Amino acid sequence: MKIDILTLFPEMFAPLEHSIVGKARKKGLLEINYHNFRENAEKSRHVDDEPYGGGQGMLLRAQPIFDAYDAIEKKQPRVILLDPAGRTFDQAYAEELAKEEELIFICGHYEGYDERIKMLVTDEISLGDYVLTGGELAAMTMIDATVRLIPEVIGKEASHTDDSFSSGLLEYPQYTRPYEYRGMVVPEVLMSGHHENIRKWRLYESLKKTYLRRPDLLEDYDFTEEETAFLDQIKESLERENL
């Protein structure tokens, strides 16, 4: 995968030299290029200007971003504009991006963009319902979530298919050694070696966590008969606890 990032602050992306993303780059599975579009600004070096019609703040000008974009060697990239008004980023979208060969991220700053910049864009994406100073942190988050899904980056597919959201549910609780720590013990079912019982326990706990913390994820979830039965048990158990 090849990723190009248009930004005023390329130095902010140093974390992408480390961990999973850094390893993917060293393996040759990922190429990341940074393009400081201030270098594409006209002689004044100004990348922003006041909005026509008045208003607060400054807008990024179209010219530096268009010129930076034009200078990138590309075929048919997915061009992502980081914008609070865009579609909310989620795991399903990360899975979409992981199938692409070329991605371009445009990171904004200041009050917003000249609307004409959006002529370059295929996707307008938001990290969530809040405003960041710039698009760099959002871009890094999306890149990390996407790159780890590329085949061979993590190694074992199960490492990410069991993650929260990959199945549509939050991930079940997990434990490692020691068996007992400060009076807290590992659930016996996980010590049993009985794979089917462990699978059922994990599914039950995933459903329970999702029902309690993110019930919105269950609204469009396609339940199996087993999952429906487990959810009924969870609701009955919680009702008894509240009596």
Curated annotation (Swiss-Prot):
Gene Ontology biological-process entries: tRNA N1-guanine methylation
Subcellular location as annotated: Cytoplasm
Presence of keyword Disulfide bond: no
Keyword hit for Nucleus: no
Chief subcellular location: cytoplasm
Binding locations of S-adenosyl-L-methionine: G108, L127, G128, D129, Y130, V131, L132
Gene3D superfamilies tied to this protein: 3.40.1280.10, tRNA(m1g37)methyltransferase, domain 2 (1.10.1270.20)
Catalytic activities: guanosine(37) in tRNA + S-adenosyl-L-methionine = N(1)-methylguanosine(37) in tRNA + S-adenosyl-L-homocysteine + H(+)
Assembly with partners or alone: Homodimer.
Family: Belongs to the RNA methyltransferase TrmD family.
Protein name in the entry: tRNA (guanine-N(1)-)-methyltransferase
